[in-house]
């Protein structure tokens, strides 16, 4: 297992976790790693309040991402409502962003 968690590694971990777990209300999913604190952060931003099913699925995603790290790491997963067209914040590495009318222009 690697000791360096760079952009490609983090994005591949997040994207693998997102396979078949993306819900229509998910606007963006992002990830970053704090190597000093040994914490991987995963942020899910939804169009309005996420359904219980979306929360459960995305918690599974965060767990799968954490599974790619050594046992002494923790995950900080956040689920926030950011109704369209409000601006998304995101963490360092954006792994998923929903296509929205502003993006399609």
What are these model-derived regions, one by one?
Residues 1-11:
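N-terminal presequence-like segments and adjacent domain-start helices
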Residues 9, 13, 22-27, 69-70, ...:
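Extended interaction regions within the primary functional domain
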Residues 15-18, 50-74:
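Short, non-transmembrane amphipathic alpha-helical segments
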Residues 22-41:
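Short edge beta-strands and adjacent turn/loop segments
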Residues 36-38, 49-51, 84:
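Generic "edge-of-domain/loop-turn" microfeature
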Residues 41-43, 76:
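Beta-strand secondary-structure signal
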Residues 44-48:
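Short beta-strand-to-loop capping motifs
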Residues 75-105:
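Polar/charged, Gly/Pro-rich intrinsically disordered segments
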């Amino acid at each position: 297992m690697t000791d360096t968690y760079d952009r490609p590694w983090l994005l591949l971990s997040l994207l693998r976790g997102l396979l078949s777990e993306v819900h229509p209300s998910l606007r963006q999913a992002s990830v970053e790693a704090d190597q000093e604190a040994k914490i991987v952060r995963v942020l899910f931003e939804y169009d309005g309040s996420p359904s219980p099913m979306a929360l459960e699925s995305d918690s599974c995603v965060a767990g799968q991402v954490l599974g790619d790290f050594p046992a002494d790491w923790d995950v900080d997963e956040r689920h926030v409502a950011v109704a369209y067209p409000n601006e998304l914040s995101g963490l360092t590495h954006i792994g998923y962003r929903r296509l929205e009318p502003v993006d399609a222009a």
